[in-house]
From Swiss-Prot:
Protein name stated in the entry: Pyridoxine/pyridoxamine 5'-phosphate oxidase
Stated family: Belongs to the pyridoxamine 5'-phosphate oxidase family.
Name of the encoding gene: pdxH
Organism field: Erythrobacter litoralis (strain HTCC2594)
Cofactor note text: Binds 1 FMN per subunit.
Subunit structure: Homodimer.
Keyword Nucleotide-binding included in the entry's annotation: no
Function of the molecule: Catalyzes the oxidation of either pyridoxine 5'-phosphate (PNP) or pyridoxamine 5'-phosphate (PMP) into pyridoxal 5'-phosphate (PLP).
Annotated catalysed reactions: pyridoxamine 5'-phosphate + O2 + H2O = pyridoxal 5'-phosphate + H2O2 + NH4(+); pyridoxine 5'-phosphate + O2 = pyridoxal 5'-phosphate + H2O2
């Protein structure tokens, strides 16, 4: 059994390295894929209206790297409308199996149409038809109406390629702040914040430890 003195000695060293935040994110995501039972790429997406009224929901991360963190959705949904009105967003990844979380903050931009097309057509056909049938975030009088819309989409496209609706697209959050958190004994948790600074070719990431 580890002694209290040994535990305290270990706690004096951060377990979150001062490194490339995107490489660290990729490493943690791979570990999450190996340990989380469901949807390790699930993330909470927070948006807000221009006057600051917030809303949050779970979405799935579909791409990540120095370019940002990408997800896909109906642009006419509540989140889509809020993104168009206020580009500032925040993401949260929480992996209970690893006792870790990552927070991301930054503006969001829409992906190119060809990128949205490629991802849309990589999805299961039923998911494509569901996107066509769903009037996301709008009132639904009866579930049977939704099923009827799905069947109508099936008939419309028959065996042909399902056309991506113009309102269905992708968004990429360009991070300006990325914070990594991990659980440690005695609630002396580990936090490291990476902040983007500079401009143009002089952009760089700086990191600092935070009190938990």
């Amino acid at each position: 059994m580890q002694s209290e003195e040994s535990i305290m000695t270990d706690l004096a060293t951060s377990e979150i390295p001062e490194t490339d935040p995107f490489a660290l994110f990729a490493e943690w995501m791979e570990e999450a894929r190996a340990s989380e039972l469901n949807d390790p790429n699930a993330m909470a997406l927070a948006t807000a209206t221009p006057d600051g009224a917030p809303s949050v929901r779970m979405v799935l991360l579909k791409d990540h790297g120095p370019q940002g963190f990408t997800f896909y959705t109906n642009a006419e949904s509540r989140k889509g409308e809020e993104i168009r009105a206020n580009a500032q967003t925040a993401l949260l990844f929480h992996w209970k199996s690893l006792r870790r979380q990552i927070r991301v903050e930054g503006p969001v931009r829409e992906v190119a149409p060809e990128v949205a097309d490629a991802y849309f057509h990589s999805r299961a056909r039923e998911s494509q038809l569901g996107a066509v049938a769903s009037d996301q975030s709008r009132p639904l009088e009866d579930r049977r109406v939704f099923v009827d819309r799905f069947r109508a989409a099936q008939e419309r496209f028959d065996e042909g390629e399902v056309e991506r609706p113009a309102y269905w697209t992708g968004f990429t959050v360009t991070p300006q702040r990325i914070e990594f958190w991990c659980d440690r004994p005695n609630r002396l948790h580990d936090r490291r914040l990476f902040t983007l600074s500079g401009a143009g070719d002089a952009l760089s990431w700086t990191s600092t430890l935070l009190y938990p």
